[in-house]
């Protein structure tokens, strides 16, 4: 009898015969080639269930592991570092790693327990690869070989009774290591040492330091730095060149000791504990003390305020160690919003994680003010309101339709709140394809796609689009959305996901169509009435076919209808005030608000 294999990545497929490939069972769409006709025959998409429950469970596990690691750092090495300071180094990595392997465990275990006849494919442990830091993990999390490795960890841990096939490919491992070494920074590695950290208190200087608030904010930074009271400085790449991070080899005895203390009655928790301790880069544990002192030896003092956002530093280890020193010495850290999912999506991950170490949060609109020490300041994206310009200058040349798509990860990459996190992206592709498929040829010829898909993606979605819709135009996304949406020839904007583009489109004030699945995005219940109003005014749709029909309808209208509809304009202003607040003097407002906090008047 032929074996039926469970496939989790593209990597396993090459080792199967044509018949085995045909009958194989796929863990998710990550190992499949996109085909719309096949999808509509089988509409059983992977649905997100209890995502916030899983999120809360992962947070509890994050806290439990973090507390154990912090205890040993302060007790065994006598490091003088606060929990708040250590959290900016460790929590961003730890939380995402836990959510990623948690999701993988739940998904794989569920499939295997349903069918004991499946033959499981796994890597030989000798072929396992390991990451040195958070940046490497983010890259590996979307790699076939590493995802097969995580699946293999689950198989080894659970000891399933299913038949198994072990895959070996040392050549690929060697090639991958060389590739990894080429792209990622190497650290100086030293053996385990009985190192004693000597705390060196740093004085606060009078400055406000800013680091990579966002590459779209360059104009703002230039103007903001002109305000000399309070004094401001921009931390550039050169500032961090003097910091050389050291990697101490793992202390396996200490890690075993910590793992013993993390025992649980739940199998999934024991798996998470084991993986977190096993894969934790020594940079974030054994190497902490030496690197803290290394940073301290290279700075004279620390700023009074430090302002940045996750877009700028999330995987930047040098910044995180520097920020930890600053926080340890009483610097106030300001976290800045960097995308449009904050607050609209329930419990935005970046917002929740930064609670561990931030003092203040700067948000794009009044929605942020629900949280203590959150400040509403103008968004710094340069998208201009086009209403007056278009109403006075509309011609028949304004006929282009911009479609703004999302980047959907192939594998789940942490964060349960939205399909934007990846893992089963065919749901998203299916919806997008349905929309395009239900447009007339006349509309399609005016449609311009701004998609962030990788052309080398093995799922073949872009190639599928190009084969089936030969007249479609694709735009270089290097041109900023801010510039593109304000072009005279753009008449209508379509957005199929709930991140920043829908807010940019509303600010541009051109007719807009939104469609995304409410069931696949954990929308904050507080704003569900807002979604219903958008539905009422035929702006928001859950069904892509209904959205396509609406586009056909409004494309025939003179654009002035959008501006004459007082209800739409009123709703638009309300949404922008909540999530995308704009002001004619943003730099001045930023300086005034931060100045008040600086002088204790907030």
Regions from the language model: what does each represent?
Residues 1-602:
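Catalytic-core helical/loop segments in enzymes performing group transfer/polymerization on anionic/lipid-linked
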């Amino acid at each position: 009898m032929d074996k039926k294999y469970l496939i989790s990545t593209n990597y396993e497929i090459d080792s199967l015969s044509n018949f085995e490939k045909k009958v194989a069972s796929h863990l998710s769409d990550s190992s499949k080639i996109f085909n719309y006709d096949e999808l509509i025959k089988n509409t059983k998409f992977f649905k997100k269930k209890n995502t916030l429950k899983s999120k809360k469970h992962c947070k509890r596990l994050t806290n439990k592991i973090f507390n154990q690691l912090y205890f040993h750092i302060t007790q065994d090495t006598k490091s003088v570092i606060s929990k708040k300071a250590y959290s900016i180094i460790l929590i961003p990595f730890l939380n995402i790693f836990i959510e990623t392997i948690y999701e993988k465990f739940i998904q794989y275990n569920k499939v295997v327990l349903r069918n004991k006849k499946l033959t499981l494919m796994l890597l030989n442990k000798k072929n396992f690869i390991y990451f040195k830091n958070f940046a490497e993990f983010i890259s590996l999390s979307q790699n076939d070989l590493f995802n097969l490795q995580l699946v293999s960890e689950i198989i080894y841990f659970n000891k399933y009774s299913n038949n198994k096939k072990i895959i070996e490919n040392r050549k690929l491992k060697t090639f991958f290591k060389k590739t990894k070494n080429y792209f990622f920074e190497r650290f100086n590695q030293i053996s385990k040492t009985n190192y004693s950290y000597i705390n060196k208190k740093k004085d606060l200087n009078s400055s406000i330091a800013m680091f990579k608030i966002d590459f779209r904010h360059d104009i703002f930074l230039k103007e903001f730095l002109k305000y000399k009271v309070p004094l401001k400085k921009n931390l550039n790449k050169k500032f961090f060149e003097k910091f050389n991070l050291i990697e101490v080899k793992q202390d396996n005895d200490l890690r075993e000791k910590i793992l013993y203390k993390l025992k649980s009655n739940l199998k999934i928790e024991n798996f998470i504990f084991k993986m977190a301790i096993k894969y934790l880069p020594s940079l974030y544990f054994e190497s902490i003390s030496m690197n803290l002192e290394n940073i301290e030896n290279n700075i004279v003092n620390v700023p009074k305020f430090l302002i940045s956002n996750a877009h700028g530093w999330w995987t930047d280890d040098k910044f995180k160690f520097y920020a930890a020193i600053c926080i340890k010495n009483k610097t106030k850290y300001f976290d800045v919003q960097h995308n449009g999912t904050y607050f609209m999506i329930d419990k935005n991950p970046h917002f929740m994680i930064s609670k561990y170490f931030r003092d203040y949060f700067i948000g794009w609109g009044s929605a942020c003010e629900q949280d203590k020490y959150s400040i509403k300041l103008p968004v710094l994206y340069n998208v201009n309101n086009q209403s007056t310009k278009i109403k006075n200058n509309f011609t028949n040349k304004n006929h282009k339709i911009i479609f703004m798509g999302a980047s959907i990860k192939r594998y789940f990459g942490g964060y349960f709140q939205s399909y934007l996190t990846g893992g089963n992206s065919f749901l998203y592709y299916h919806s997008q394809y349905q929309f395009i498929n239900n447009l007339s040829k006349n509309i399609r010829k005016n449609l311009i796609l701004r998609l962030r898909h990788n052309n080398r993606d093995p799922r073949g979605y872009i190639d599928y689009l190009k084969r089936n819709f030969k007249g479609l135009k694709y735009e270089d996304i290097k041109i900023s959305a801010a510039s593109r949406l304000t072009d005279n020839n753009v008449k209508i904007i379509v957005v199929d996901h709930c991140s920043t583009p829908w807010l940019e489109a509303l600010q541009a004030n051109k007719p807009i169509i939104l469609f995304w699945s409410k069931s696949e995005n954990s929308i904050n219940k507080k704003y569900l009435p807002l979604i219903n109003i958008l539905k009422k005014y035929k702006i928001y749709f859950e069904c892509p076919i209904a959205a396509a029909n609406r586009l056909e309808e409004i494309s025939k209208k003179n654009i002035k209808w959008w501006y004459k509809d007082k209800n739409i304009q009123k709703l638009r202003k309300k949404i922008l005030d909540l999530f995308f607040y704009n002001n004619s003097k943003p730099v001045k407002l930023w300086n005034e608000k931060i100045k008040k906090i600086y002088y204790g008047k907030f």
